[in-house]
Amino acid sequence: MSTPIEAAWQLAKTRYAGLNIDVEAALKQLDQIPVSMHCWQGDDVAGFENTGGPLTGGIQATGNYPGKASTPDELRADLEQAFALIPGPKRLNLHAIYLESAQPVARNEIAPEHFSNWVAWAKRHQLGLDFNPTCFSHPLSADGFTLSHPDEKVRRFWIEHCQASRRISAYFGRELGTPSVMNIWVPDGMKDLTIDRLAFRQRLLSALDEVIAEPLDQTHHIDAVESKLFGIGAESFTVGSSEFCLGYAASRGTALCLDAGHFHPTEVISDKISSAILYVPRLLLHVSRPVRWDSDHVVLLDDETQAIAHEIIRHQLLNRVHIGLDFFDASINRIAAWVIGTRNMKKALLRALLEPTETLRKLEQNGDYTARLALLEEQKSLPWQAVWEHYCQRHDVIPGSEWLQQVRQYEETILTQRQG
């Protein structure tokens, strides 16, 4: 006797077959698309340097939900709990401040040995790792500048930090057999009117050239640069603007990172993918949810998340676009935040894979925009949820909202025992 989920799955296959959509092929392709989940949702971007300093760089984690991770083992345990509730392939994105060392380590002296536990853990769980230098929350970034700093000594420190980070990233890729994407984002900018914008950008250009000068095997490591419109305390001028980073990636052959919250509120990165990909070899996406500013709310299955997935799938860009998430909400259960956001990204990818894209494309090419719109809207009502639930069961993952019960149980037995 079939279960309701199995019965719905069989009906869904029949419905989609009527539109010439191979559901099995879609699920097979979904199994080839990893989503890189960010570690910093688990501890509000605190890291393990244990300096006691505040989060800086024009970003904020708001809320004080109990039970956040404060040690590497706690964070890994929380990640395992989240991963168990997310179907399909996954990666983990680490920042440099998540190193492990018995003694304090200067950021320009970090080395692969400080991340060996993460690599061993990733091997056990069949995960790829991605990386980021951490150019904020540090005394030498307190005045708002790092790689573009006018003081050569300060600038040198951050150049060395990014160079060390690249070697760690390459170590990840070498050990795990999948390239690590290392994204460089700097908070450099000014609160008020800036006279010599060119000098700051010339210094950033030169510094980045030094950072990426060491040749590294691209099967192990991929460089990316990320722009931003503004941050708290850098409202008037951001050195690494969109034009700067696009120009840098295009001229140096790096990947370009598009963060959903790093542009003007009326802009969306889904519209930028098909333009930027014409000029850069790869894109890194930071899928997020900006609410009036770069607030990094948990990703929803909303129009923009769906549009991002459509752009990747419609244009067959999976081999050139790396999908990562970037949000941190300290007002709700942090494990639930991971699960909600990552499942939503995967749901959006599944829906994109189930779209009758070739039919829609032919309608567009023939100028039949009436039929294009009608079909676009009607296919939203197709039974993709039945396919999703079947996919979850294939991966031994709870298909519906019942996963929250596991999170609540973990919260009661583990998170409530933590201090702070």
UniProtKB/Swiss-Prot annotation:
GO terms for biological process: L-lyxose metabolic process; rhamnose catabolic process. It comes from the Bacteria. Its cofactor is Mn(2+). Binds 1 Mn(2+) ion per subunit. Pathway: Carbohydrate degradation; L-rhamnose degradation; glycerone phosphate from L-rhamnose: step 1/3. Keywords: Cytoplasm, Isomerase, Manganese, Metal-binding, Rhamnose metabolism. GO terms for cellular component: cytoplasm. It holds the Pfam family RhaA. Its main location: cytoplasm. GO terms for molecular function: L-rhamnose isomerase activity; manganese ion binding. Mn(2+) binds at H262, D294, D296. It is an enzyme of class 5 (isomerase). It is found in: Cytoplasm. It catalyses: L-rhamnopyranose = L-rhamnulose. SUPFAM superfamilies: Xylose isomerase-like. Its EC number is 5.3.1.14. Catalyzes the interconversion of L-rhamnose and L-rhamnulose. Belongs to the rhamnose isomerase family. Homotetramer. HAMAP family: RhaA. PANTHER family: L-RHAMNOSE ISOMERASE. This is L-rhamnose isomerase. It comes from Pectobacterium atrosepticum (strain SCRI 1043 / ATCC BAA-672). The gene is rhaA.
